[in-house]
From Swiss-Prot:
CDD domains cross-referenced by the UniProt entry: RNR_I
Inducers of expression: Cell cycle-regulated with highest activity in S phase. Moderately induced by DNA-damage.
Gene3D superfamilies assigned: 3.20.70.20
Protein name: Ribonucleoside-diphosphate reductase large chain 1
Organism per entry: Saccharomyces cerevisiae (strain ATCC 204508 / S288c) (Baker's yeast)
């Protein structure tokens, strides 16, 4: 059997030669479990006559990827083979690659089609020796196989369909695209990104250094006006933004409802849905950067709009096709008044914005006064508030949407409140910025890789978290994002105007779950909750400090005066809480009041779906969804096991084919294994096995340091109206801005697992674990304070205990989510004297025949116990086991 070499030569397939090549790439891997000969045997079985060496390397990489379930080091080996293959096919010198991309001529048209901007090309040519020598190609081998395949599929630039860039080339291109002629800053960014301390968001990786460097991820668009001209001008703006890889949040509160009078034609309006379908088709047609990602729009609507029932159902799988728009994402911009009416089982009135103008232009007490005035004047149609609430929950259970964002919390706790009323969030519910017909809000994103700051002692017995290093890196990311604002290509002038005036940025995180697992902290432990607080306090302080330093050099952003920050009010002040106290907030506050900040907003932890795949971590701040899952690439589907769990099971001596099949049957859960120590069961709980109350508590803890919001998904294995209501009201009373991004659920029934041998799977419970082999470093919590000596930490000291996971402030029990007084994070449940009778919510009345949109029929007993029960909503009862939230 013959193989064709890269130079066209033909030679016999040699077993020993393949084995030697694989062995050379096994450095640093576990020799007990990585067998180069076994890999070669599997490769040979798939070889065919006339295979090329490139195809042979691809086959070898895929073979190792399939063996990842044997040991996680096989994933590393797969990546090394794939990257070694890429290195053989691509030019090494960065400057030569840039030149090839710059001088690219389109084969179909014969015309020049440069993929690198003139500016970046000239910078590279002028500094090519310095840049070429700065690149460390060995860092390419630190990517996982699936991380590399993600880069290869969508991020690395191609010439005539062939990948031309290496991962290190991409990172240097991004660094130069951001910093231009500031070579030292570019090299700092290159080194930190290539060492995987942080990554910029996908649009920045796609477009930095290209002729049209649109590096922003998020755009918040305002409907220009309720007219044909206004609607179609807005549609064009959305198309231009989507064309350049931007995700869109669009508020449509001001569009008249179905049946409203149209003065210009003396007719009546068709309402929101036909217009929404036009936007739906635009999202389908205009993808993000040539099939890299589909176009994506989220539409925001307040629940008083008369078309609200049709709006929340647009993604449902059944119903009339002409009232569906399944490529858009509905989102609710909910005022506190609606939540109060649901809680009280009160009425709710629906209006057309033409008959009740101004409701979207105010919030808080002003909104309530205007809304109740319109109600008294009889301008709308009144329904039971819980009827609409039920329809919202029904849609969420079926489709995962609509998203829930709280209007009053977003406006009340924003540093942009001096600009006007904020009317929407973005596609992923983490960006909260002011937008107007002449200003499209923009945000540039980057995420810090949290596991990169774990340090293990020389003897391997203890591990610590380096907050000082995290602080330094977060400041670098802040400076980078601020630079992106100036170097960015803006698809529409409204976006340029807004971004230059207010200069918001968004720092996020990825790998929080990985950090907890590496430090051996269960996600729902008190230690993990404290670390969560410390991490976000550190990043917020770093971002504000860096922004203040930039303001001292370049001046504050244009609209700084009049903002809360200009008065010394920071995000935790708006929550009426004091910071944990690791950092010197008093000095920073004084500096901000004196010099200003360069950026109006700095924090917004976002979903990191693609970039966390690249770096090999779990998404953003979420727990793991499963300890075993499938990963699809072009060549097929691969089973992937949580690498931390897999190493532990291998060391315990109980990982085998039976254990693998057991995990598949249990959807990645190890909770039913009698031979696994309890500490591992606690450590490797999936999100389905963690109380959602814990998730919401941790979200509220970090929100004190998040001046925008964050993309908070909620997870319910089997959602019911009671559980959903309980979660929504708990999050609202905690003061969250984003109550829910997606609702994630599990299928009601599992597919038949034809490939599983149940007898083999059952043997997994019989293996005897050798706990003596499980030696891992223990976490040493940080007691360091980086505050000035005269700064007294508010709230808690480094050695203080933090609240139990069931604790909450008395303010969070009230009907209004606004905090009523300063309170310490150490206040526990025992200190509270909460009366169950504070909140009484009557049961949902049975739907009557003449109601326009009857609720689905449910069992009476389930309705009485499950829906809007006062105990479920208040969550303040003596017997936690009787509460849906407390019992998990």
């Amino acid at each position: 059997m013959y193989v064709y070499k890269r130079d066209g030569r033909k030679e016999p397939v040699q077993f020993d030669k393949i084995t030697a090549r694989i062995s050379r790439l096994c450095y640093g891997l576990d020799p007990k479990h990585i067998d180069a000969v076994k890999v070669t045997q599997r490769i040979i079985s798939g070889v065919y006559e006339g295979v090329t060496t490139i195809e042979l390397d691809n086959l070898a990489a895929e073979t190792c990827a399939y063996m990842t379930t044997v040991h996680p080091d096989y994933a590393t080996l797969a990546a090394r083979i794939a990257i070694s293959n890429l290195h053989k096919q691509t030019t090494k010198q960065f400057s030569k690659v840039v030149e090839d991309l710059y001088r690219y001529v389109n084969a179909a048209t014969g015309k020049p089609a440069p993929m690198i901007s003139d500016d970046v090309y000239n910078i590279v040519m002028e500094n090519k020796d310095k840049l070429n020598s700065a690149i460390v190609y060995d860092r390419d081998f630190q990517y996982s196989y699936f991380g590399f395949k993600t880069l290869e599929r969508s991020y690395l630039l191609r010439i005539n369909g062939q990948v031309a860039e290496r991962p290190q080339h991409l990172i240097m291109r991004v660094a130069l695209g951001i910093h231009g002629r500031d070579i030292e800053a570019a090299l700092e960014t290159y080194n930190l990104m290539s060492l995987k301390y942080f990554t910029h968001a996908s649009p920045t990786l796609f477009n930095a250094g290209t002729p049209k460097p649109q590096m922003s991820s998020c755009f918040l668009v305002a409907m220009k006006e309720d007219s044909i001209e206004g609607i179609y001008d807005t549609l064009k703006e959305c198309a231009l933004i989507s064309k350049t890889a931007g995700g869109i949040g669009l508020h449509i509160h001001n569009i008249r409802s179905t049946g409203s009078y149209i003065a210009g034609t003396n007719g009546t309006s068709n309402g929101l849905i036909p217009m929404i379908r036009v936007f739906n088709n635009t999202a389908r047609y205009v993808d993000q950067g040539g099939n890299k990602r589909p176009g994506a729009f989220a539409l925001y609507l307040e629940p008083w709009h008369a078309d609200i029932f049709d709006f929340i159902d647009i993604r449902k799988n059944h119903g009339k096709e002409e009232i569906r728009a399944r490529d858009l994402f509905p989102a609710l911009w909910i005022p506190d008044l609606f939540m109060k009416r649901v809680e009280e089982n009160g009425t709710w009135t629906l209006f057309s914005p033409t008959s009740a103008p101004g409701l979207s232009d105010c919030y808080g007490d002003e909104f309530e006064a205007l809304y109740t005035r319109y109600e008294k004047e009889g301008r709308g149609k009144t329904i039971k508030a819980q009827k609409l609430w039920y329809s919202i929950l029904e849609a969420q259970t079926e489709t995962g949407t609509p998203f829930v964002v709280y209007k009053d919390a977003c406006n009340r706790k924003s540093n942009q409140k001096n600009l006007g009323v904020i009317k929407s969030s973005n596609l992923c519910c983490e960006i909260v910025e002011y937008s107007a017909p002449d200003e499209t809000a923009v945000c540039n994103l980057a995420s810090v890789a949290l596991p990169a700051f774990i340090e293990t002692s020389e003897d391997g017995k203890t591990s610590t978290y380096n907050f000082k290093k995290l602080h330094e890196i977060a400041k670098v990311v802040t400076r980078n994002l601020n630079r992106v604002i100036d170097r960015n290509y803006y698809p529409v002038e409204e976006a340029r105007k807004s971004n230059m005036r207010h200069r918001p940025i968004a720092l996020g995180v990825q790998g929080l779950a990985d950090t907890f697992m590496l430090l051996r902290l269960p996600f729902d432990s008190e230690e993990a909750r404290l670390l969560n607080i410390q991490i976000f306090e550190t990043i917020y302080h770093a971002s504000m400090e860096a922004s203040c330093e930039l303001a001292q050099k370049d001046g504050p952003y244009e609209t700084f005066q009049g903002s809360p920050a200009s008065q010394g009010i920071l995000q935790f002040d708006m929550w009426d809480q004091k910071p944990y106290g690791m950092w010197d907030w008093d000095t920073l506050r004084k500096d901000i009041m004196k010099h200003g900040v360069r950026n109006s907003l700095t924090m917004a932890p976002m979903p990191t779906a693609s970039t966390s795949q690249i770096l090999g971590y779990n998404e953003c701040f979420e727990p793991v969804t499963s300890n075993m899952y499938s990963r699809r690439v072009l060549s097929g589907e691969f089973q992937v096991v949580n690498p931390y769990l897999l190493r532990d099971l291998v060391d315990l001596g109980i990982w085998d084919e039976g254990m693998k099949q057991y995990l598949i049957t249990q959807n990645g859960s190890i909770q039913g294994l009698p031979n696994v120590p309890q500490e591992l069961k606690d450590l490797y709980k999936t999100v389905w096995e963690i109380s959602q109350k814990t998730i919401i508590n941790m979200a509220a803890d970090r929100s004190v340091y998040i001046d925008q919001s964050h993309s908070l998904n909620l997870f319910l294995r089997a959602p019911t109206m009671g559980k959903l209501t309980s979660m929504h009201f708990y999050g609202w009373k905690k003061g969250l801005k984003t109550g829910m991004y997606y609702l994630r659920t599990q299928a009601a029934s599992a597919a038949i697992q034809f490939t599983i041998d149940q007898k083999i799977a059952d043997q997994a419970t019989e293996n005897v674990a050798d706990i003596s082999n499980l030696k891992r470093p223990s976490y040493m919590p940080s007691s360091a304070s980086y505050a000035a000596s005269d700064f007294v930490p508010a709230a808690v000291t480094a050695n203080a205990t933090i609240p139990s996971l069931d604790s909450s402030s008395e303010a969070s029990r009230e009907a209004s989510p606004a905090p009523t007084g300063s309170h310490s994070l150490t206040k526990g449940m025992a200190e509270l004297n909460v009366q169950e009778s504070k909140v009484e919510v009557p049961e949902v009345p049975a739907p009557t025949k003449n109601e326009e949109k009857a609720a689905p029929i449910v069992d009476d007993e389930e309705t009485e116990f499950d829906i809007y029960n006062s105990k479920v909503i208040a969550c303040a009862i003596d017997n936690p086991e009787a509460c849906e939230m407390c019992s998990g």
